Amino acid sequence: MERHRFVDTALANQAYEDTSLPIGLGQTISKPNVVARMLELLREGRSGRLGRVLEVGTGCGYQAAVLSHLAVEVYSIERLRGLHEKARENLRYFRLPNVHLLFGDGMVGYAKGAPYAAIIAAAGGEAIPQAWIEQLAVGGRLVAPMQTAKGQQALVVIDKSAQGVRQTVLEAVHFVPLKSGTD
């Protein structure tokens, strides 16, 4: 995916470096290796395309564009109107009919599209919102950053089965904070 199309032209020469870059409104586009790691975790143990995926935190739209090649359908929700509009503009070039951009509070997910085979978040909070777990299909997987007891963030994988959920805490990461509401 052409990452330079998702950052400001002044930063285009840094688009392929393994670094996060500002995208406006105090938000960033994640490092390419972090995006790759999260998608790898989302797909681990699964073959073929993922079914319906919910992405929380559209940002500039880059990860939604990558997800469009891995999933049958992508619902991506952004709480900041300015970024929602920027993502819409960025994605227009690619004409991805399986990507649905939503403006709203990602902490409540998007119940109309549920259940999801996978949920991925680009912002981290103190806990995984219950709405996400409820909207995750049985057999589904959720990958998100979450604050640990030490106050740091770590990637968390949640697998949902008929018996319940299993949470695995992985490596340290640094994401923008997960916030409720819209702006």
Predicted regions mapped to residue ranges:
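Glycine-rich beta-alpha junction loops
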Residues: 1-2, 148-150, 173-174
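N-terminal auxiliary segments of SAM/dcSAM-dependent transferases
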Residues: 1-11
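Short clusters of hydrophobic/aromatic residues that line enzyme substrate/ligand-binding pockets
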Residues: 6, 16, 21-23, 110, ...
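Conserved alpha-helix/loop element of class I SAM-dependent methyltransferases that forms part
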Residues: 10-20, 25-52
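Conserved nucleotide-cofactor-binding alpha/beta core module
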Residues: 39-166
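Short, solvent-exposed aromatic-acidic interface loops
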Residues: 169-179
